[in-house]
Amino acid sequence: MIAIQGATIYTMAGGVIHGGVILVEGQFIQAVGAELAVPEEAAVVDAKGKFILPGLIDAHTHIGLEEEIYRIEGDDVNETSDPITPQLQAVDGINFMDLAFADALRGGVTRTMCMPGSANILGGQAVFLKTLAASPAEMVYRNPWGLKAALGENPKRVYGAQKKAPKTRMASASLLREAFANARGLMDKEDIKTAELYRNAAIFKVLRGEMPLLLHVHRADDILTALRIKDEFGIEMQLQHGTEAALVADELVKRDVPVALGPLFTNRAKVEMKEVAFRNAALLAERGVRFCFITDHPVIPIEHLRVCAALAVREGLEEEAALAAVTSTPARMLKLDQELGTITAGKRADLAIYSGHPLDFRSRVERVMVDGYWWGKTVE
């Protein structure tokens, strides 16, 4: 057993405990409180004066798929030979030795979603990862988790340059509808061919409500197109990026469609990102839209996830909402809130110890725990 004592603990479950104790047994949090008795056999970590948060969750990255320094060799994020590739699995392209996994831990990020890029209308299946494990195979936590799709500039730019569809937003929407309509027609067939089953299996899961469509979209008009498609096929959808989501907030709230918001700590790289701003987080919160922050690593280095939260507070977001948007909210969006996202008894022991307040840029991550295993030096 491990006992971490003396820290200010942000449980993200409705309270802050000053000078508290966290007891960890194996992979799980056994207890947390202000006045817990520490068992004699426990290995004690003195965290007096420190701050503890649940491990951060980045719900949208390309970690291991798009490496920072290996260019062609480390770029496996977009399969640009076909705009419809739902059969692809991000896990098959990940380099688990990517330096970014250590960067994630340095930033307090203990779990992350890795997904294909946005060149394709249907890009493939996402995988949810731990950033630390005893082996690369054990870093895979949920696979698959969601089917990546895209509307907007990227598919029409990539395939328009190849002189094939989609060259317009109309064609992008049409191809997405066609893929789902074809799959729906095949779903209950008894004599479906093996190749058709393999190619459409992920779409079947979305149609059956077994996993969501993770739809890359920035502009308000593209968001409305996405919502029309959601309504037509009755599927669960989560928006990725959602730069102009605040403009259509009522429509999102009506359908309970959440937004993986970001990357915000970046320039206006494309026309459809002209409204990118940290104030967008506060606007979504005011209008009741569920959202979490994402880095879209390597667009923003994954270790800067909490910097995004801090800058959103500067632009009007409440501190509690900002911290939730990198912990408990992504856990709920990923349907893993029974396991992750808060420091409560029974949850997995994902913790990060900070030298100061987590939203203070000067604070450093001193130690990280993932599933009960430590990464980093002993707290000084």
Language model feature labels by segment:
Residues A7, I22, Q27, G49, ...:
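Divalent metal-coordination and catalytic microenvironments
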Residues K50-P116, N120:
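Metal-associated gating/positioning segment near the N- to mid-region
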Residues E68-I69, D75-S81, T85-L88, P212, ...:
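His/Asp/Glu-enriched, well-ordered alpha-helical/loop segment
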Residues A7-Y10, H18, R332, T344-E380:
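C-terminal cap of metal-dependent C-N hydrolases
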Residues A100, L105-M237:
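Polyanionic/metal-chelating signatures
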Residues K230-M237, V253-A260, G288-R290:
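Glycine-enriched alpha-helix->loop->beta-strand junction motifs that scaffold or abut catalytic
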Residues I2, I9, A13-L53:
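Histidine-rich, glycine-flanked metal-binding segment
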Residues E67-I94, S135, A150-V158, L207, ...:
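Active-site gating loops and adjacent loop-to-helix segments of metal-dependent hydrolytic enzymes
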